[in-house]
């Protein structure tokens, strides 16, 4: 039995995302970004990886990169509420209130099933 089976992980990309989550939780966002980029290389349509990448980029004060990561997640899944919400929060931090409100409202609609 290999490590992926032992951890009940479906793919190497999922394993890499879990590693990234652990690094992000300890504040090592640069390492998390590296894991996430590897996960995306393995599975280019992994919306959760793009969203977590955006979160880490935000923590590293790379706001434009974070927005681009959320946009990639949303191109894959336009109904991914977490990406809409996180994008809205960054836009709000950047003073882009109108765009932020639109994104956050979209996320609320999706969370509520509207």
Question: Residues of each region from the PLM?
Answer:
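Alpha-helical segment of the N-proximal tetratricopeptide repeat
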Residues: 10-42
């Amino acid at each position: 039995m290999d490590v992926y089976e032992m951890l009940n992980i479906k793919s190497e990309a999922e394993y890499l995302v879990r590693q990234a989550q652990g690094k992000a939780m300890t504040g090592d966002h640069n390492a998390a970004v590296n894991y996430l980029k590897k996960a995306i290389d393995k599975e280019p349509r992994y919306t959760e990886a793009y969203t977590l990448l955006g979160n880490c980029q935000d923590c590293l004060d790379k706001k434009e990169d974070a927005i681009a990561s959320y946009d990639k997640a949303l191109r894959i899944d336009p109904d991914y509420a977490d990406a809409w919400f996180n994008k809205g929060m960054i836009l709000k931090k950047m003073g882009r209130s109108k765009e932020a409100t639109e994104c956050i409202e979209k996320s609320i609609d999706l969370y509520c099933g509207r």
